[in-house]
């Protein structure tokens, strides 16, 4: 098989200072596309037609897997041949196909965070950081039409796609208790489109 993959990525970031606060923001976009080409898979629908004897008409190419397809061959009806020979290129072309499977994934991610000093205590400044992040991921797979229809000798496959989004916020505190001793605390809230909300603290 042959696989052709294209990958794209865009990343942007910004860092600045507003008053005494450090602010940063970012945006990331990424996409992956691939096409998988597989040669030599059998078209089971055409095989049935080719082996159907007198019912193989029109564009159908008759096939006798037991031989009798050489230059001296003669079709005598009811799926029977006389003569010698082997399967011809025309027969192979009729009962095989070139499969094209496609897949794609895309991700979008953006957010910001702010950090600075919230207050001054005898032991030092109280540090704080908070921020927000959004991420969306989606993807899909599209098998070849013959494979999706169950007309292939390869593994069966069906089209599939899906996506999820998540929004997250966080808050972190660093509180000086004494010289060289800090008390830290943090909490993160996440809201997933796939299964709901979670809150984690430490």
Model-derived segments and spans:
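Residue-level signature of outer-membrane beta-barrel architecture
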Residues: 16-18, 116-120, 171, 175, ...
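Transmembrane beta-strand segments that form the barrel wall of outer-membrane beta-barrel proteins
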Residues: 181-192, 201
């Amino acid at each position: 098989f042959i696989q052709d993959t294209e990958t794209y990525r865009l990343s942007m970031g910004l860092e600045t200072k507003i008053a005494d606060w450090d602010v940063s923001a970012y945006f990331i976009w990424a996409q992956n596309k691939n096409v998988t080409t597989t040669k030599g898979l059998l078209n089971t629908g055409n095989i049935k037609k080719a082996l159907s004897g007198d019912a193989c008409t029109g564009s159908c190419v008759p096939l006798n897997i037991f031989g009798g397809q050489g230059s001296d061959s003669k079709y005598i009806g009811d799926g029977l041949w006389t003569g010698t020979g082997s399967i011809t290129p025309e027969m192979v072309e009729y009962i095989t196909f070139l499969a094209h499977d496609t897949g794609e994934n895309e991700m979008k991610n953006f957010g910001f965070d702010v950090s600075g000093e919230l207050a001054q205590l005898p032991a030092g400044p109280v540090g704080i950081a908070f921020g927000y992040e959004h991420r969306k991921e989606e993807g899909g797979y599209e098998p070849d039409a013959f494979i999706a229809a169950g007309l292939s000798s390869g593994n069966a496959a069906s089209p599939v796609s899906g996506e999820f989004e998540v929004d997250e916020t966080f808050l972190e505190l660093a509180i000086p208790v004494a010289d060289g001793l800090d008390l830290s605390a943090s909490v993160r809230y996440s809201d997933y489109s796939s299964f709901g909300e979670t809150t984690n603290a430490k």
